[in-house]
């Protein structure tokens, strides 16, 4: 379990160039990607009432999302996650799964109790959650691990139908969720944001009140939950 504060902004490409140049002077690239760059695919779940979507859009103090996430279209690090947000404070529970478990989860099948993901899957199934949309984007990330600081730039955000094949390989055919000239800046920290990060990110674009999940649900074709 990890808890942190997240701030999100939507910025222009020109702002991205300015801010990323400053961030590179004080943070280091995320080691999980070449020069801190990698792609992410997240398959989100919701129920027939769109509870996960509505909790966010209705301004609920607490909202919960379940997702399966892959990196760079590879199957070596598949994660089932539950993300809980209370205002700007985020708590994440995560479990590694393999392709066999992925298939079972997508089919709504039961999971053996000895699996790490059992609790998450049981909760998700009890809520009647089924695949809702796949969100795909490219991320550029910079970190300062000793202070728990993470700054990311997400671009090329696409909405795709929620099928297993959208999590792996070179996925095509997505619908852009935001302009290709827009970037989502996320500032993440565990206690407070250092002043030098604030200085790097000063005069940023407007704060984003919706999630990539919500953006992609609205842009993509409705999936039959």
Give each language-model segment a name:
Residues 1-225:
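Phosphate-end processing signature that detects enzymes handling 5′-triphosphorylated RNA
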């Amino acid at each position: 379990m990890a808890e942190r504060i997240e701030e999100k902004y939507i910025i222009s490409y020109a702002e991205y160039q300015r801010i990323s140049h400053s961030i590179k002077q004080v943070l280091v690239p995320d080691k999980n990607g070449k020069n801190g760059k990698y792609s992410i695919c997240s398959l989100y779940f919701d129920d027939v009432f769109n509870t996960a979507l509505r909790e966010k859009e209705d301004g609920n103090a607490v909202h919960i999302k379940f997702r399966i996430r892959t990196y760079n279209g590879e199957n070596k690090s598949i994660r089932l996650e539950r993300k809980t947000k209370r205002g700007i404070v985020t708590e994440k529970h995560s479990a590694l799964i393999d392709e066999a478990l992925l298939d079972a989860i997508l089919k709504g099948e039961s999971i053996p109790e000895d699996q790490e993901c059992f609790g998450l899957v049981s909760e998700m199934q009890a809520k009647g959650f089924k695949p809702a949309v796949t969100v795909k984007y490219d991320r550029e990330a910079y970190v300062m691990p000793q202070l728990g600081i993470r700054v990311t730039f997400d671009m090329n955000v696409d909405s795709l139908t929620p099928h297993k094949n959208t999590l792996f390989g070179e996925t095509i055919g997505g619908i852009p969720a935001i302009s290709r000239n827009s970037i989502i800046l996320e500032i993440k920290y565990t206690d407070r944001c250092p002043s030098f990060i604030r200085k790097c990110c000063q005069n940023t674009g407007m704060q984003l009140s919706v999630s990539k999940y919500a953006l992609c649900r609205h842009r993509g074709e409705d999936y039959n939950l």
